[in-house]
Amino acid sequence: MRCTLLKHGAQASDIYTVQVPGSFELPAGARLLAGKQKLDAVICLGCVIKGETSHNEYINHAVATGLTNLSIASGQPFIFGVLTPDNEAQALDRAGGKHGNKGVEAATTAIRMAALKKELTDKTKIGF
């Protein structure tokens, strides 16, 4: 992810990395970070592997809803980069393995959404 941001013009000093205890805390951590720094986007990465119960579904739904609500309320892109695999092998396949890299995808989404926000903010025309 970091390499993707740097490749597209981000400065290393402008990339902030913070960690939260678990995926469930991603929305709260993202909100705390966004409240302290002027950021173009907030990329939230995590992994919730399915267990023997449906607990993962509640976590995934809460995180997705939390990040969506933050994006809508703030007008700032909060990017959902959470893997939701059934097992560790699937997680590794999606974290740079044979099924791509969710971190790179999240970084690309952040770049595109930040560009869209800038484009729409800079426009003086009214659109409907």
Regions found by a protein language model. Give the residues of each.
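Phosphate-binding/catalytic loops
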Residues: 86-100
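Glycine-rich phosphate-binding loop
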Residues: 25-67, 71
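A charged, well-structured terminal subsegment
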Residues: 100-128
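Glycine-rich phosphate/diphosphate-binding loop of Rossmann-like nucleotide-binding domains
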Residues: 2-21
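Short, ordered loop/turn segments at secondary-structure junctions
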Residues: 20, 46-48, 83-87
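Mobile beta-alpha loop/short-helix "lid" or hinge segments that flank ligand
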Residues: 74-90
